[in-house]
């Protein structure tokens, strides 16, 4: 029959063009089939170029048929090639392996035709064609490496099936030659399940494209739709297309069909030749969203957007403007595209917390757009630092230049020093004393306000690296790597430590003066008194401005530990300037002993003194460590 010969020629040309040896698809051509057979028989010579091919054949598990399955062909005996495929019985979840015959690309037409057209008891053909699901199910039960896309393409080129699907927009049958219109076949997405809802959608899309062509030929520059109607139509099309793209595929078939259908879709050239008015861009969009060869359950049960016009489909799928449209349409498309971009940027920016929330609260008037961009980049760096635990010092100090890089190095050394002196490096951060962790974070926030959001993550990363180095057997007191330190960073670190020491001394003097000037009648309630002055005495005198090139940072120190307890971080970083406090403590205790016959300190004061003593000892260790590192730096420089 003439129509069948034309159908065979067109389908065969498409198969060779799409699944041929030149295409990067996971299908088996005649040449590849014979090569696999030779490799399994051991007749193919070993070379370096076929090592990858041998590995692929071995991984797939190709097998030759049994001797009784060897059948004679036109040119002699032809061996049958099988491949194991995982299958399920449809009831349980147990998978089993079953052999499927390898389908050759050159035989796709004969295989699909034999499964699609039913035959009678005597071998005669019955004019009864199976549907897409039944055809593909029968093929998948017997063959492998035959993608669903080829089955759908075959059914869409079958004249009998097209008559049954009523694709003709006029409602009449096709011509006697049975050739489908090129416009219809170009609009079909061959990875979509051929359901009645899909066919109705394609029919309406074809009608809309013809109406758009007629209107554009008569009045190309006229825009007769009202503003609200046009925008609502575009928005409805946008939402419908987004819903189609968000539908999750349903896994119905084996892995070899998924790979072949996903990788063979790039060879379908008929989709690229469809005109803009016929909605080719929309069909290409749906093809991309379903290119894995799987069908969505929602697509079988719910009809698609039947009011979807090719013009709006092109707009929503590609987010670009057609230059051939009228000025009025371009105006509303520009508005829609700008709204979409603003919403997308708002969602992206809203998912990230601002990096400097504390400092930007006091210096919000000095913030700029450049500062916001830098904050987001810093925040992304923190997320990477949390994700990758295998880096010892994961701060990207080389990505920034000048003062920022040096301050980042100083910040890293600042955290390392305070962790070494105050925390047990073999204990995770979740099991460390929360007061000590908070004290280190507060100190980092005072001295390096631009990196305040990194403090906790930096502590956690350093503790992880210490535990990892301990397991590896390295020395824990290793020097800081050369790429993480410099002379400028050391000077910044020294300035930060000195500033922290002065601040600690100032806070302790203010607390001691407040304690001495407290009324005698409130001594019976030491807890309440210390809680009040620890939060009221310091803010008025602790206004420190930090200028770092991106804005002015203003920090107001608020004691968060309460109870009159000495800040452990302040005590650990307090240097020799705090020796005057010891003398003040002695004189105050002497005056109290002279006034009272029996000198006695409260438990809170005793605890504060003990912590002060521990702080001085830790400060001495800190100074000794700093001196050793500075000496090592001098030796490295010389």
UniProtKB/Swiss-Prot annotation:
Residues 211-225 have a biased composition (Acidic residues). Expressed predominantly in fetal brain, adult brain and testis. The keyword Nucleus applies. Residues 364-374, 391-403, 503-515 have a biased composition (Basic and acidic residues). Residues 229-254, 263-281, 302-312, 351-363 have a biased composition (Polar residues). GO terms for cellular component: nucleolus. Its main location: nucleus. GO terms for molecular function: RNA binding. Residues 588-597 have a biased composition (Low complexity). It is found in: Nucleus, Nucleolus. Keywords: Nucleus. It holds the Pfam family HTH_NOL4_2nd. InterPro entries: HTH_NOL4, NOL4/NOL4L. Residues 210-312, 343-403, 503-535, 573-603 are annotated as: Disordered. This is Nucleolar protein 4.
């Amino acid at each position: 029959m003439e129509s069948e010969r034309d159908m065979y020629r067109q389908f065969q040309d498409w198969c060779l063009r799409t699944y041929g040896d030149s295409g990067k698809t996971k299908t088996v051509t005649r040449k590849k089939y014979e090569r696999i057979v030779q490799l399994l028989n051991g007749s193919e010579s070993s070379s370096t170029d076929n090592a990858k091919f041998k590995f692929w054949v071995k991984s797939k598990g190709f097998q030759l048929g049994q001797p009784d399955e060897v059948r004679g062909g036109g040119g002699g005996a032809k061996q049958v090639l099988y491949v194991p495929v995982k299958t399920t019985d449809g009831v349980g979840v147990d998978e089993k392996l079953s052999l499927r015959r390898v389908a050759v690309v050159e035989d796709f037409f004969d295989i699909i035709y034999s499964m699609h057209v039913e035959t009678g008891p005597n071998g005669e053909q019955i004019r009864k064609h199976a549907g897409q699901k039944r055809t593909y199910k029968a093929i998948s039960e017997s063959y492998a490496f035959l993608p669903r896309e080829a089955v759908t393409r075959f059914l869409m080129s079958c004249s009998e099936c097209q008559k049954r699907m009523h694709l003709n927009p006029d409602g009449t049958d096709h011509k006697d030659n049975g050739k489908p219109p090129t416009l219809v076949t170009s609009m079909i997405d061959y990875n979509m399940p051929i359901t009645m809802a899909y066919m109705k959608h394609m029919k309406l899309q074809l009608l809309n494209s013809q109406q758009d062509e007629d209107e554009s030929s008569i009045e190309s520059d006229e825009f007769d739709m009202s503003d609200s109607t046009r925008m609502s139509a575009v928005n409805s099309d946008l939402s419908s297309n987004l819903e189609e793209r968000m539908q999750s595929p349903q896994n119905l078939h084996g892995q070899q069909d998924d790979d072949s259908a996903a990788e063979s879709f790039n060879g379908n050239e008929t989709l690229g030749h469809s005109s803009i008015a016929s909605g080719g861009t929309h069909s290409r969009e749906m093809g991309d969203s379903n290119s894995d060869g799987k069908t969505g359950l929602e697509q079988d049960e719910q009809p698609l957007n039947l009011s979807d016009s090719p013009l709006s489909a092109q707009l929503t799928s590609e987010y670009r403007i057609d230059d051939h449209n009228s000025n009025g349409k371009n105006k509303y498309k520009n508005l829609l595209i700008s709204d979409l971009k603003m919403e997308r940027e708002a969602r992206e920016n809203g998912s990230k917390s601002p990096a400097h929330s504390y400092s930007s609260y006091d210096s919000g008037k000095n913030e700029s757009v450049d500062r916001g961009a830098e904050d987001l980049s810093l925040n992304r760096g923190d997320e990477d630092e949390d994700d990758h635990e295998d880096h010892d010092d994961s701060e990207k100090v080389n990505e920034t230049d000048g003062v920022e890089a040096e301050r980042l190095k100083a910040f890293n050394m600042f955290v390392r020093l305070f962790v070494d002196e105050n925390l047990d490096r073999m204990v995770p951060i979740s099991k460390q004393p929360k007061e000590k962790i908070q004290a280190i974070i507060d100190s980092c926030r005072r001295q390096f306000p631009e990196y305040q959001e990194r403090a906790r993550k930096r502590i956690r990363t350093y503790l992880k690296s210490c535990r990892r180095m301990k397991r590896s057997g390295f020395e824990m007191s290793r020097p800081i790597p050369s790429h993480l330190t410099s002379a400028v960073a050391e000077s910044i670190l020294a300035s930060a430590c000195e500033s922290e020491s002065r601040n600690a001394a100032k806070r302790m003097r203010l607390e001691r003066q407040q304690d001495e000037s407290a009324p005698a009648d409130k001594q019976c309630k030491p807890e309440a008194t210390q809680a009040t002055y620890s939060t009221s005495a310091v803010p008025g005198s602790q206004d420190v401005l930090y200028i770092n090139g991106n804005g002015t940072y203003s920090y107001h120190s608020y004691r968060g530990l309460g109870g009159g307890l000495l800040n452990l971080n302040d005590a650990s970083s307090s240097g020799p300037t705090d020796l005057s406090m010891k003398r003040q403590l002695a004189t105050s205790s002497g005056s109290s002993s002279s006034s009272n016959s029996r000198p006695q300190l409260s438990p809170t004061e005793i605890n504060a003194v003990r912590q002060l003593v521990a702080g001085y000892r830790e400060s001495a260790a800190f100074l000794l460590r700093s001196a050793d590192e500075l000496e090592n730096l001098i030796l490295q420089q010389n």
